[in-house]
């Protein structure tokens, strides 16, 4: 494999000295970029884009051509795993992801099993192809949804505002939900390990919906299964550590519990104070975040002010990867994203070295 020319992102995740704070953006390859829209149109549909190795590589690289980012993230979707389980993923115009066969009956849940990873070969092919295209420029991040977040879509049959169906199952038939979650955890472990084998140099677990749970439920139905995954992941590849990032949106209440599961870093959403988070768990884990995606809709001056505030809140030393507190909004101005990236690099140097 090619030598990594910029390993700042990996070093920051392991709290090793860096010259500046690295930055990447969740959903950095996406609809806010006109070049992404053009490639997506060429692919025909979102799923076709995910499954086309050449085009998935193209859209992964696009933001790196535009911005001085310190990592690339695989272009894919968290729902590839339940799709491989045979639930029939499709995207309804204006409604987001849907499943033809939602898991709402005991018989269907009993039949659920870890999918053959060959069904997800298109993802691993994309990882290998992207690594080749990157040619050591920056590290490549692989990812998956968390068992609970995947279960939300699998049980609800799509996205939801109140999660009534899955919460009803959780409180009335927890045994059924635990069966789904355990299957998901085994599948995600195999999926991420296969991404690492294909060339992913760090992995992130997205727990997008963990924050809708009560304190006790989060620990029993979400964190327990993320811990199971982290324990089963390959942590060494190509002679270096493969860092694991866990991002639970709305998870600021549970940082101490999350810091104990063996991950290298925790992602923070924009509602957390990063300085306070560092005081709470900074000895155990690196932190990633946590610029409000909608702060990109401000002025260039307000973007710079917000970057300066977050960097100052975190303070001196390594262990911070700058990111948004959630995915970049599709209506964001790419020029403002560029200001964000360049400002982080410019203003963060004073917090490192010396």
UniProtKB/Swiss-Prot annotation:
Key words, A-Z: Cytoplasm, Decarboxylase, Lyase, Porphyrin biosynthesis
GO CC term (a single one): cytosol
Cysteines engaged in disulfide bonds, as pairs: none
Keyword Cytoplasm: yes
Catalytic activity field: uroporphyrinogen III + 4 H(+) = coproporphyrinogen III + 4 CO2
Record pathway: Porphyrin-containing compound metabolism; protoporphyrin-IX biosynthesis; coproporphyrinogen-III from 5-aminolevulinate: step 4/4
Enzyme class: lyase
Catalytic activity, EC: 4.1.1.37
Gene Ontology biological process terms in this record: protoporphyrinogen IX biosynthetic process from glutamate
Location relative to the cell: Cytoplasm
UniProt site (Transition state stabilizer): 77
SUPFAM superfamilies assigned: UROD/MetE-like (SSF51726)
Entry binding sites for substrate: 27-31, 77, 153, 208, 326
Primary localisation category: cytoplasm
Keyword Lyase: yes
An example molecular function term from Gene Ontology annotations: uroporphyrinogen decarboxylase activity
Matching CDD domains: URO-D
HAMAP family: URO_D
Protein purpose: Catalyzes the decarboxylation of four acetate groups of uroporphyrinogen-III to yield coproporphyrinogen-III.
Subunit structure: Homodimer.
Entry's family note: Belongs to the uroporphyrinogen decarboxylase family.
Stored NCBIfam families: hemE
Name this protein carries in UniProt: Uroporphyrinogen decarboxylase
């Amino acid at each position: 494999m090619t030598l990594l020319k910029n390993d700042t992102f990996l070093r920051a995740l392991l709290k090793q000295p860096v010259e500046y704070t690295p930055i990447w953006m969740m959903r950095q390859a996406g609809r806010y970029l006109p070049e992404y829209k053009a490639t997506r149109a060429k692919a025909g549909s979102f799923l076709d884009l995910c499954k086309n190795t050449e085009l998935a590589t193209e859209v992964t690289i696009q933001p790196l051509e535009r911005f001085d980012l310190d990592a690339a993230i695989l272009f894919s979707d968290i729902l590839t795993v339940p799709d491989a389980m045979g639930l029939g993923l499709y995207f309804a115009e204006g409604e987001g992801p849907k499943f033809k066969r939602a898991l709402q009956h005991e018989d269907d849940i009993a039949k659920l099993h870890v999918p053959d990873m060959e069904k997800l070969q298109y993802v691993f092919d994309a990882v290998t192809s992207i690594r080749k295209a990157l040619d050591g420029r920056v590290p490549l991040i692989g990812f998956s949804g968390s068992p609970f977040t995947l279960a939300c879509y699998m049980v609800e049959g799509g996205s939801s505002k109140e999660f009534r169906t899955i919460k009803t199952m959780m409180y009335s038939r927890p045994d059924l939900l635990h069966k789904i979650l355990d299957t998901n955890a085994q599948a995600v472990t195999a999926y991420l390990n296969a991404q690492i084998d294909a060339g992913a140099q760090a992995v992130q677990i997205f727990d997008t919906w963990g924050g809708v749970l009560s304190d006790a439920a989060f620990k029993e139905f979400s964190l327990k299964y993320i811990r199971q995954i982290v324990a089963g992941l390959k942590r060494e590849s190509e002679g270096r550590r493969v860092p694991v990032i866990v991002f639970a949106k709305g998870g600021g209440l549970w940082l101490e519990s999350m810091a104990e599961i063996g991950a290298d870093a925790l992602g923070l959403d924009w509602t957390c104070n990063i300085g306070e988070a560092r005081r709470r768990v900074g000895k155990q884990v690196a932190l990633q975040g946590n610029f409000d995606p909608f702060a990109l809709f401000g002025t260039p001056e307000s973007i710079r002010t917000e970057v300066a505030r977050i960097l100052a809140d975190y303070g001196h030393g390594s262990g911070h990867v700058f990111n948004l507190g959630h995915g970049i909004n599709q209506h964001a101005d790419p020029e403002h994203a560029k200001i964000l990236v360049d400002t982080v690099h410019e203003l963060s140097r004073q917090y490192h070295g010396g």
